[in-house]
């Protein structure tokens, strides 16, 4: 099979980007391992051009700081459009629904395949600052435009795809991401790791997430406050950084809560997750929940928001869902501590492999690249062998933006 050149585009890619960065890096490395060329274009402080250990060429384009936390930068689409013709891509893989949404039409105009990976629920994000009715309307208009602009839209779970199903987008594929089963393992739960992170506490809780509003990061503090009030010798380790760090430290004052900041060392994070009794995953908008999957791979059960994609994962007996209140999460944590959930945790995580995700994504890239190449190279005025037209009914309800 002929090798492809896949160009990945990802603003907001940085050391603290969490699941997005992990997904982009794992997919890119998998493509290279299978003989394809990969160029990753990201935003940063200054221009850079380097080859990563994975074999991926990473080009950094100067970008402006987008959020309060360092590492979230966005490069101008104009700069990226100037760069793309020099790269010779067969297919684009875009991991940004906001600042790079115009890359799909650009790819079509240049005969290049295009895939957009939806890493979040747009309707949920808009709803953080707008009434639900407004959020639904705005996301429907935007999602309709996105689906029309790209050859394929990839969602990581059925939950993530619900907002595209609502506008009847016909070009949506569900591709679950993977988890690093080699790094995150139950056998890391050694007495040394337990002592390091628990400091003698009877119950060790972990919460690994970005400390920003949409993640509901104060939930873990509410839980440990309730447990301590009932005489439980509990300790909470919060691994992550974000705009709410100072506020959360104030809330946790006087409680057995430790803030590690961003844990850049994956081995440290893996030891922590394996040593914990329960991983708290409070974000109600998670479309996949990579940090939760890393906890499960480590053999640690999870307590999750019943309004996120992770609620479906817990049906396999690896944890419990809870309503988005401190009391509900505390009750679920108590139930998990009293139950037998660890056995199912690793088994659940083993269903999600990067090999499977990479192979599925390569199939989509091949299909879109071949179709665009055919349309680009057919004789002028030729009409034969074009792809069947899609039903107009799915597109006609609203004008794309």
Language-model features, listed with the residues they occupy:
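Conserved donor-binding/catalytic core segment of Leloir-type glycosyltransferases
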Residues: 198-225
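Aromatic "clamp/platform" in nucleotide-sugar-dependent glycosyltransferases that forms part
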Residues: 284
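Nucleotide-sugar donor phosphate/pyrophosphate-binding loop at the beta->alpha transition
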Residues: 75, 113, 124-145, 149
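Nucleotide-activated donor-binding/catalytic signature segment of Leloir-type glycosyltransferases, i.e.
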Residues: 246-263, 267
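Conserved acidic donor-binding segment of nucleotide-sugar-dependent glycosyltransferases
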Residues: 259, 316-327, 334-339
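Short alpha-helical donor nucleotide-sugar binding micro-motif in glycosyltransferases
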Residues: 262, 271-276
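Short hydrophobic beta-strand element within catalytic cores of glycosyltransferases
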Residues: 301-304
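Carbohydrate-associated surface elements
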Residues: 159, 178
